[in-house]
Amino acid sequence: MEGIFAAYVLPALIIALKSVVLLVVLLIVVAYLLYADRKIWAAVQLRRGPNVVGPWGLFQAFADLLKFVFKEPIIPSGANKGVFLLAPFVSAVLAMATWAVIPVNEGWAIANINVGILYIFAISSLEVYGVIMGGWASNSKYPFLGALRSAAQMVSYEVSIGFVIVTVLLTVGSLNLTDIVLSQNTGLGTMLGLPASFLDWNWLALFPMFVIFFISALAETNRPPFDLVEAESELVAGHMIEYSSTPFLLFFLGEYVAITLMCALMTTLFLGGWLPPVDVWFLNWVPGIIWFMLKLCFCFFLFAMVKAFVPRYRYDQLMRLGWKVFLPISLFMVVATATFLKVFGLA
């Protein structure tokens, strides 16, 4: 009996505990990233932003949470009730499930699997189903149009993201996210005879792919300037028009968890994960999770600034950028990277 407990029950309990801790921390981080998003947007528009609930408005996100929870969920009379209520859960659960393999520090991942990046790509590809289900089940034309746009948009830019990931895999030789981070201890800077620093990270050696990944991540998460799924001037709120109360909150949560995931992926694939920017003794004392969070916040700041400054693309411009610009460039970079590694014996 003790052998069964040690072999099966105890590992399951540890994984469950890790999952609960990750979920709580992730929700708190998302709440304050939402607060930061609103503050940055307000600063650009010369406003104060959230400033009522708590000091400097720090508890505004939690007040909004309570407001949504205590509202009455209204289901349209012509809606498919089961699918209508299931869609937000699908969106939120899939967004949070991808975090199981993200290493926020060395050894700090719920599941340090050897196909981690493939797992993320597979699960994140399914998130579009929550949007499609919500748009279809609402039995309204505007949510349905938003869902159709979302399907086309997310599929279009997943192709470019896939080629970006392939390029990183070619340079690293592993699908394990921890290996991808550790491989950035040495890189282009070391080859040029420089001390270990942020110049070794993949953002410099694969800079075109870094830019493509960043812009594709904006489109994949329906962020401005690619927020055509919920374009206020056309579709009001897209697939979320008919949603209120907790179902709307779950859709909103899934969207921001997906944004945070893309920031974490940028940090892991291109910005050295938990590695310090310069290999000096006093920076090595700082816990790796601090560096990871600082880089994640920097990526989110870029997302927020794009939202504040860049006007929305037209739908035809969005599709043209994905298929006629990013796809050829990313495919060329995959071939060029593979050729370079083969010619110089680095494969």
Curated annotation (Swiss-Prot):
Q: Which GO terms describe its molecular function?
A: NADH dehydrogenase activity; oxidoreductase activity, acting on NAD(P)H, quinone or similar compound as acceptor; quinone binding
The chemistry this enzyme catalyses reads:
a quinone + NADH + 5 H(+)(in) = a quinol + NAD(+) + 4 H(+)(out)
Membrane topology according to the record: Multi-pass membrane protein
One Pfam family, short name: NADHdh
The entry's keywords: Cell inner membrane, Cell membrane, Membrane, NAD, Quinone, Translocase, Transmembrane, Transmembrane helix, Ubiquinone
Annotated localization: Cell inner membrane
Which residues are connected by disulfide bridges in this protein? none
Q: Which regions span the lipid bilayer?
A: 13-33, 50-70, 82-102, 115-135, 161-181, 198-218, 246-266, 286-306, 325-345
Question: What's its top-level EC category?
Answer: translocase
Q: Provide a GO CC annotation, any one.
A: plasma membrane
Q: What is its EC number?
A: 7.1.1.-
Q: Which GO terms describe its biological process?
A: aerobic respiration
Quote the InterPro entries the UniProt record gives. Answer: NADH_UbQ_OxRdtase_su1/FPO, NADH_UbQ_OxRdtase_su1_CS
Classification via PROSITE patterns: COMPLEX1_ND1_2
The lineage's top-level taxon is: Bacteria
Kindly state the subunit structure of this protein: NDH-1 is composed of 14 different subunits. Subunits NuoA, H, J, K, L, M, N constitute the membrane sector of the complex.
Stated family = Belongs to the complex I subunit 1 family.
What does the UniProt function comment say about this protein?
NDH-1 shuttles electrons from NADH, via FMN and iron-sulfur (Fe-S) centers, to quinones in the respiratory chain. The immediate electron acceptor for the enzyme in this species is believed to be ubiquinone. Couples the redox reaction to proton translocation (for every two electrons transferred, four hydrogen ions are translocated across the cytoplasmic membrane), and thus conserves the redox energy in a proton gradient. This subunit may bind ubiquinone.
PANTHER family (alphabetical): NADH DEHYDROGENASE SUBUNIT 1, NADH-UBIQUINONE OXIDOREDUCTASE CHAIN 1
What name appears for this protein in its UniProt entry?
A: NADH-quinone oxidoreductase subunit H
Per the UniProt entry, what species is this protein from, by scientific name?
Answer: Brucella anthropi (strain ATCC 49188 / DSM 6882 / CCUG 24695 / JCM 21032 / LMG 3331 / NBRC 15819 / NCTC 12168 / Alc 37) (Ochrobactrum anthropi)
